[in-house]
């Protein structure tokens, strides 16, 4: 890839960091309350484009970007590991440890904390250590650490460690490898975290490893990429109105189409029209790290208003996303102003 194309791609990715994190906030504001709002069909149909169609795009897109950037880098394997130690492992250990400490404080004041059905006060040393990995249940790869969204960082760390192996696999199999795991992912009826991670990370890695220019590819086949984006979006939304076969595969294929569309078109569009904030981009990883605990407080709120009409639920949901995001950004701004060095460390030098 030439310097111009790489710069264009880098600008798109940088511009998209906060919008993609925002999609994850949309997702978790929904999943934290979905058990309460079940049965509100109008509510579900109205928020689906934001909560699940866009909401479930964020993590696959970040896996794709991570694979793309890791192999575009000219650093050695050891240098990449050192870099990811700061950008991934330190934040992973810090924020999971912080959540455990908060839980222990709540236990001290008489609260009962259950994690995966087990009382935290009964935890052994092994249980505490395992809480950093999967909270005591691996669940075929769908288990998450004590800070649930960090399954993404856990899987990304594993993929970075295995990157030399993935390099040779992709060098000789090219798209065959991500396509095989992609077929398993789109047809898996559980969350399929492992297959999602492998599919999107290896798909992103394919471009630099096999010397394919993503920007040039999009410009050459723009009609195909844009057409796929709209086709899979329509097929995904269609199941809201009628029962269709292969609804889940269409949904997951739409996540792949969204990823290509956002990186190759939408990010560039935002940058060219100056719809971009450097501050918000820098805050995005911190927002990802702390947003989830705030979303868990939404369930009692939705339990109180569950009897109201669906439009009120939709408005409450949208306001919840705005409030959670603003709180996280405000906390970031305050901490950055009073403890900039500390924020730099816990966010992996992303400030």
Q: Language-model segments: which ranges?
A:
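Membrane-cytosol interface segments of multi-pass membrane proteins
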Residues: 1-181, 305-351
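Hydrophobic residues within membrane-embedded alpha-helical segments of Major Facilitator Superfamily
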Residues: 23-26, 61-63, 200, 207, ...
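Interfacial loop-to-helix transition and helix-capping segments at the boundaries
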Residues: 47-59, 141-154, 185-202, 236-262
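Short glycine/serine- and small hydrophobic-enriched flexible loop segments
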Residues: 68-72, 167, 205, 209, ...
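Transmembrane alpha-helical segments of multi-pass membrane transport proteins and ion-pumping complexes
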Residues: 205, 260, 296, 325-333
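Aromatic-anchored segments of alpha-helical transmembrane domains
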Residues: 26-29, 96-97, 178-192, 227-241, ...
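Loop-centered beta-sheet repeat module
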Residues: 162-211
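Alpha-helical transmembrane segments and terminal signal-anchor/GPI-anchor hydrophobic tails
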Residues: 4, 199-202, 210-286, 292-302, ...
